């Protein structure tokens, strides 16, 4: 009877614990953090903290001893574990490279059938090589990521990721490749370099770590770990100025072409405007253009004479520049309306000529109708061909005399004298 009573009491206690656990299930989160990735043989610290889902409106359990954290971390080797204030921390070491899942959940103490209050997982990468990264700094602040200024010193450093101080007794060597053909071997993780030309460069560093380790047979041996790291650098030139090539005197309705040369690295955000005076541009007066080269051509036609000023503003990721260009526009002696006068004159002349030719053709036809052709033929025949149709030369001469009354006689008359 006593045993039956004990069993009932035990199950009743479990149900009391199970009730709150079921009610609380789904109301909490487990925040899981780790200082990985890590190198094979180094120690990794993983922490799990119980948190409320609704940002603190629900209180955490008052008695932290009523709950337990359960971990699954195989095949990683557990080196230490501790729990405090609903936070559990473990230390593990990986013997082989790979990505290993870590799982943790929280349940009520002494109740394995209770539903977990919260659970969480993460993937821990273990690498054969060293773990770290390259840090590049310069005494400038640019808005473009990984962008730096040419002809200024760059500080490049390698930061080893070793939170457990596993490599504190190791010796390191660094082989730097700056991407422009320059190589440097040093035992210092920090170097300084100056790029003289703009462009995109990939800086690489090979890190070698060596240390002595006692083998199982009590002999010392040298252990070596290596790692290859790289970083992309975008070197840009500051915008030092704008060169404007173009005329300063112009006539109206004449096409103006200006060439702008930018002394700086593209891309460039260019803004230009036209004013009577050389004053800074407002945003509403700006004609924005994105220039991807170091030159830009601008064309414009002035319709009114006067004094004008072109205002140019350009900026890249490093700096800004302004430039002005004054120009005088004179009235043109060859205005566009002058084209209409010669065209109208030419058309008028053509019309007059056509009318003249038409009238002349009509008059000629009228003369031909009024003058019979037989008269002319008769005259021609009488004058030119008379000798062929007349019977004697005397008749021919008579006809000629009739037609040409002023012709002298062909023979003198014989004078007779009487004595």
Swiss-Prot record:
Name the UniProt key words of this record, in alphabetical order: Glycoprotein, Golgi apparatus, Membrane, Signal, Transmembrane, Transmembrane helix
Identify the residues that the record assigns to the PKD domain, covering every copy: 144-230
PANTHER family attached to this UniProt entry: MELANOCYTE PROTEIN PMEL 17-RELATED, TRANSMEMBRANE PROTEIN 130
Q: State the protein's name.
A: Transmembrane protein 130
**Which gene name does the record give?**
Tmem130
Give residue spans on the Cytoplasmic membrane side. 358-419
Signal peptide limits = 1-25
Q: Which residues are glycosylated?
A: 29, 85, 194
Tell where it localizes.
Answer: Golgi apparatus membrane
Q: Which residues cross the membrane?
A: 337-357
**The keyword Nucleotidyltransferase is annotated on this UniProt entry:** no
Organism per entry? Mus musculus
